[in-house]
Design a protein with these regions (language model features):
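N-terminal accessory/pre-domain segments preceding catalytic cores
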Residues: 1-181
């Protein structure tokens, strides 16, 4: 008899079709070392929850990303950036992008890197001390911030910015000592 989680995992692996091997590499990678058992559980969680999550691909999407990055990192006022981005969005409606299931295109290297960085942040960040494993899986572990986001190195880019900001939350467990927690 197969558990519900094993059936969900197998369903995702089947849905991945030719990309199945990439997802299996992630499971194999974390299966090699007993010390990675929690990372293996996290990897299985991510993979099981991939169905229904999509990314955009294709030349139109690549052109849109390049153009939006150019605007975002330009040295113009925020109002001008917003105006330019709104104009760009009208030039590239979502219908002109090819949408594919994440499980069919995500790479093992990308997932492994994201899992490892998420674990580092969870285990080393003072701000994350009170986060349970289930909360970690739901809120810190996901491999992208928004639906249809490109598989980029967002954690590496945002980490220095976020870590500086999150240092202010070193004492974030104070809320559970209040009457609201009772």
């Amino acid at each position: 008899c197969q558990s519900t989680d094993n059936r969900r995992l197998e369903k995702t692996l089947d849905l991945a079709q030719s990309n199945r091997g990439e997802l299996e590499k992630v499971i194999q990678y974390y299966s090699q070392n007993e010390a990675d058992s929690l990372k293996l559980k996290a990897a299985r969680f991510l993979i099981m929850n991939m169905p229904g999550h999509y990314s955009f691909i294709g030349r139109n999407y690549e052109n849109y990303c390049k153009a939006s990055e150019k605007i975002i990192f330009s040295k113009t006022s925020m109002n001008k950036k917003v105006d330019k981005l709104n104009k760009l969005i009208r030039q590239y409606p979502a219908e002109c992008f090819e949408r594919v299931e994440d499980c069919s295109i995500i790479t093992a290297d990308y997932l492994i890197q994201n899992i490892n960085i998420a674990f580092e942040d969870w285990q080393r960040g003072n701000w994350a001390k009170g986060i349970t494993f289930n909360e970690f899986c739901e809120y810190l572990l996901p491999y992208k911030c928004t639906e249809t986001q490109a598989f980029d190195n967002w954690r590496t880019v945002l980490r220095p910015i976020a870590n500086d900001t999150l240092q202010d939350f070193e004492h974030n467990d104070l809320w559970n000592k209040t009457s609201y927690w009772a």
